[in-house]
Amino acid sequence: MAEMKGDPIPVSNQEKQQGQAILETILEAVLEITSGQRGPWIIGLGFPGLKTSDKKGIAALVNGPRMPTLACDIELELKKNQIDLATPIHALGSDADYCGLGEEKGKDGHFTGVKNAYYLGGGTGVADALKLHGQVLPFDQIKDWMAKTWELTSNGLSFEKVLSARGIQEQYARETKTPTHELTNQNFFISRILEKAQAGEPEALNVCALVGENLGLLLFERLETIFCGWQNRFQFINPNRPPLQSRHEYQGTFLERFVIGQRLGTALADDENSRCIWDKMVFTFDYLIEHSTHRELAENYTLRMEKLLTISSLRDAPVLGAAIDAWTNYRSQTHAY
């Protein structure tokens, strides 16, 4: 956090090694894409985490290293490999916002055809995206009245620790008293946990029920906050976070669609018949709707959960969003078409 305020923090050797591995992976991908083709090239990059003040680096990252000069490092490596860029990397965008942009512009995107939709992606972490009144809104633009999922806790448990693929693995490790690294070494991730639940294993069923309950809680809060304003339903990981405003310009808006993507979406798709996650999710959401003190909300959404929710198979949504943002920025600077 101090780094974002302009106070450089020495990056540890371990972080440097992790950052170098990420840099080499990016370089390898770019070299593969550009092999045998002529440039110059335009590159868009989306990353999780808090960005540096110039938006060219990562100042803080829950599941990875700080990389304060990442964009410049990438440009330097590309130059060494004679990869010409049409323009410098304009910024490291939000992978979450890019998910929304990809869902809006992608051929099979699920933000199309509706004016108001919420997206939740679950992978290494969690990603939020929101479309209101026909516009995809960056979450940083609405942070005064809506929190990102990773910021929120319920009953002392972080939503990211329950709804991300990595968090679900950690919950299963806790239930089975198995070290997380052992599960990773065995390739035991969310799909395997769901298979265990479908086979009736109590520990896996408990984890799936926990996922379903928290997903129902979160989706109701999103709907409620958009329609009514923040109701203090959850707590924050950071107790010093400024309070959310209870009023905003979009109040009275009904969400038309929930979109669940990435590995969490895949798990829900695989669970559609077995209902290990679905039943608890639907029950929790419907219960909150039925007991809502906001009459219009209750009238509009009673028994509608399954009609609202759709699963995205657009795993490339954030990549597509990054490309669109880079091209849009380039066009605005050069008036290219």
Each language-model region and where it sits:
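Extended charged low-complexity segments that act as oligomerization/scaffolding linkers
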Residues: M1-G19, F188-A197, E203, P242-L255, ...
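Glycine/GP-enriched mid-protein hinge/lid loop-to-helix segment characteristic of carbohydrate kinases
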Residues: M1-Q18, D73, E77-K80, D84, ...
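Glycine-rich phosphate-binding loop and adjoining helix at the ATP-binding site
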Residues: A2-L31, G36-N116, I142, A269-L297
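Phosphate/ATP-binding catalytic cores across multiple sugar-kinase/actin-like superfamilies
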Residues: T25-I33, A209-F254, D325
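Short helix-terminating capping/connector loops at secondary-structure junctions
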Residues: S35-W41, Q82-T87, F111-G113, E182-Q186, ...
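Buried hydrophobic side chains on well-structured beta-strands
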Residues: L45, L215, F258-I260
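Glycine-rich phosphate-binding loops at beta-strand->alpha-helix junctions
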Residues: G49-K51, V62, L205, F227-S292
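Active-site metal-binding loops of divalent metal-dependent hydrolases
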Residues: A96, T124, L264
